[in-house]
Amino acid sequence: MNLLPKSSKEFGSVDYWEKFFQQRGKKAFEWYGTYLELCGVLHKYIKPREKVLVVGCGNSELSEQLYDVGYQDIVNIDISEVVIKQMKERNASRRPRMSFLKMDMTQMEFPDASFQVVLDKGTLDAVLTDEEEKTLQQVDRMLAEVGRVLQVGGRYLCISLAQAHVLKKAVGHFSREGWMVRVHQVASSQDQLLEAEPRFSLPVFAFIMTKFRPVTGSALQIFELCAQEQGKPVRLESAEQLAEAVRERQQYAWLCSQLYRKAGLGSVSLDLCNGDTGEPRYTLHVVDSPTVKPSRDNHFAIFIIPQGRETEWLFGMEEGRKQLAASAGFRRLITVALHRGQQYEGMDSIQAELSARVMELAPAGMPAQLQVPFLSVGGDIGVRIVQHQACSPLSGDYVIEDVQGDDKRYFRRLIFLSNRNVVQSEARLLQDVSHRAQKKRKKDRKKHRPADTPEDLPAAQGQSIDKSYLCCEHHKAMIAGLALLKNPELLLETPLALLVVGLGGGSLPLFIHDHFPKSCIHAVEIDPSMLEVATQWFGFSQSDRMKVHIADGLDFITRLAEEEARPHYDVIMFDVDSKDPTLGMSCPPPAFVAQLFLQKVKSILTPEGVFILNLVCRDLGLKDSVLAGLKAVFPLLYVRRIEGEVNEILFCQLHSECKLATPELLEMARALEQTLRKPGKGWDDTYVLSDMLNTVKIV
């Protein structure tokens, strides 16, 4: 499969690209490759028996080398009399059928339709040095003459650096004439960027403009990009799309050259896309470890992230990837994330597919013939099974998928595709049913099963969920906050009223429902699609103790606060995300922590109750403001940071005299856990409530 790189936004900025052009200077116009570097594209688009016109031939050896391999019907023109004289003398006896003529390419003397190919190596670039009117008029005359002397079906093959203004002019001119436009990257030009002293800093392209017979009234325009020597051309919809595709190739080439010369460029990421569909297939992150002492075998490695685990901190966050690279012990580590919706046959096929591309990102100084290792967790690519995909009018596109963890256990995840790197909800599948599959699916799968796929896939039924297991660390901390209630050792026998805003997959309210038999829970969810997801895929169900209200949490609490006989809750939990990624606070939406609204929350909380809030805020100033606002309404405020995540769990109470010292708080957590650990009742042995509270701090 052909893989096309697409640079990340960091390398698409105007400032970055402008700086590059300032450093380029004029040297780039002076070299476009030898015959050996261009022969692949030349032989692809020129047949040996065709009549070829070379415009602006100069003293290049290109025509001579083409002649020597069988392309002998070649006419060369140049405006320089000195050059033409030199070339005639150099070729008169050895290449008698090749001619050299002094001629202005904007006023050629050949009859119409004299040639099948017009070959231009850098001449258009040399003429089109700016966009002044005089220059553009000269280029118009040149291109018009090219069109005149070419036969229908003939090609204008122009070797160019494809700077934006040159590409725009050439593509615009010939597409308006109804010609087919193709841009083909010269494969060897990428290698030149990795030389110790490259002769230019841009990849070389060939424009192949094919002359079609004019059709009156036809608006058909054909634009294609061929980004690899043997790759299939990709059809594009517009000249703008073609220009963008070329720009991405140039940016990628520049990125490769910079990575070759320098370490520690900062956060560098790019997508490798399916060459046929354009869909992202791999996401690469380049991580340098300057402190690693170089040796022969530790220069460069590739780490394949198992499918479905790209959201984990170690792989999904920059700090995590730095830790991974340091522990791996290589100067440069490239992490590779596999995309859902793509088929992968196994580690060997991925290695074969990626080898050429990742070597373009290698650092300088690697020993010759060094075998670059491909690493992974457990030596395989993991398992990801997409169980369901749909679109919610409120939350957008989402996916339900089952992924295999470290211990071969399966986990079900809800992911909003608007934020692919965040797991919205997660649940563990029960081991005894995690490998059941419907017979039809098994039968279909036997026809074609990729490597590293288990014989049986996880069952789709919601009943396969392990309801005793909390996957999310912030959910574990929120449950531990119930130890702040009076007499936690008696909570299983105490009627508890809880309000949970934000349902997601339903794991949090479901855990409370199953472990606190006297609890009565009201869950509020704005998106009806999420109730459907929780019910069908995460084992959630309503009962006389569990009611779900489809409503905006703001409206629901406001309405309760305005009731004369308003209810009072022992526990209120906010686990609700914001749909606006620009705010600096992704959980909860800012309106949920506004002073006026917090007063309403306070009015429906029992005097000794606890308000528990999942806060995700990267803006430190905004976070300080939120904490100050909470403190103004709830005098007692505990904060528990979730290690390796941005999440902070806030425990808010109404009376500061209820403040507990850490030893006292831990003792209450142990008492609650001892009560919850009942014989015959499922419990995760790794879940220790006191561990969730031992780093709690009072604000």
Swiss-Prot record:
Disulfide bonds: none annotated. It comes from the Eukaryota. It is found in: Cytoplasm; Nucleus; Mitochondrion. The modification N-acetylmethionine is found at residue 1. Its EC number is 2.1.1.-. Keywords: Acetylation, Cytoplasm, Methyltransferase, Mitochondrion, Multifunctional enzyme, Nucleus, Phosphoprotein, Transferase. The modification Phosphoserine is found at residue 267. It holds the Pfam family Spermine_synth. Residues 433-460 are annotated as: Disordered. It catalyses: L-lysyl-[protein] + S-adenosyl-L-methionine = N(6)-methyl-L-lysyl-[protein] + S-adenosyl-L-homocysteine + H(+); N(6)-methyl-L-lysyl-[protein] + S-adenosyl-L-methionine = N(6),N(6)-dimethyl-L-lysyl-[protein] + S-adenosyl-L-homocysteine + H(+); N-terminal glycyl-L-lysyl-L-glutamyl-[protein] + 3 S-adenosyl-L-methionine = N-terminal N,N,N-trimethyl-glycyl-L-lysyl-L-glutamyl-[protein] + 3 S-adenosyl-L-homocysteine + 3 H(+). GO terms for cellular component: cytoplasm; mitochondrion; nucleus. The keyword Nucleus applies. InterPro entries: Lys/N-term_MeTrsfase_sf (IPR051419), Methyltranfer_dom (IPR025714), SAM-dependent_MTases_sf (IPR029063). It is an enzyme of class 2 (transferase). One of its GO terms (biological process) is methylation. GO terms for molecular function: protein-lysine N-methyltransferase activity. Residues 436-449 have a biased composition (Basic residues). Its main location: cytoplasm. NCBIfam families: MFS_SpdSyn. Forms a tripartite complex containing GAB1, METTL13 and SPRY2. Within the complex interacts with GAB1 and SPRY2. This is eEF1A lysine and N-terminal methyltransferase. It comes from Bos taurus.
